[in-house]
Amino acid sequence: AEQERIVACIQEAELVIENYAIKATALQKLQDSFPEALKKSILQEAVQGKLVPQDPSDEPAEALLERIRAEKQRLIKEGKIKKDKHESVIFRRDNSHYEKLDGVERCIDDETPFEIPENWCWVRFGTALVNRDAERIPLSVSQREKLDKKYDYYGASGVIDKVDRYLFDKPLLLVGEDGANLLLRSKPIAFIASGQYWVNNHAHVIDAVAGVDLRYIALFINATNLAPYVTGTAQPK
């Protein structure tokens, strides 16, 4: 009888220990993932306009958008940028969002992932920003080996080498174009490059006009789930 009680007691203790181990493992996973989850949550609140109080005296987004259009028109006339082939205009009507593109209007409510403050507005990236991808020049490893190591050479996830010349000499937003990091997010896919540097064709180069803050654009991209837009399996793009 004593042996039976001992066996029963040990079995009960083993069950408690097993349950404790399961809960301890779950707690460790939560602790490991919490910092990154909290960061993503804060980013999401920020891009939705919920992180800081909205000041009604702030300039509405439409006014900024008008300045952006005027500045881009000036740059087009000066030959510094090319005119958008397909100009997009997004507006609200009847509590829905519509886009006018190539003279055709369509509802885009299914493309707006969340509600935004009343004085904000949705725009396509090409409307608010300037794409400078045409200025990128890729250099092979063998080409780079022959160059002095002076200026940063950027790829999809950041600096991957140094070269003896540069293409850009102002802060610009770089967005990784391909690679597993598009889904894994072990590093930010959007980041600011500064100083004098070179960029290969694995990172998009984005410039801003009329006071658009590229740091906010980087936050928005890094808070966005790109899985629905990624193509390719061996090499996501």
Question: Where are the predicted features?
Answer:
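A short beta-sheet element
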Residues: G155-V159, V163-N222, L226, T231-A234
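Proline-centric
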Residues: A1-E14, E18, E45-A46, F114-V123, ...
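DNA target-recognition patches
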Residues: H97-R106, G126-F191
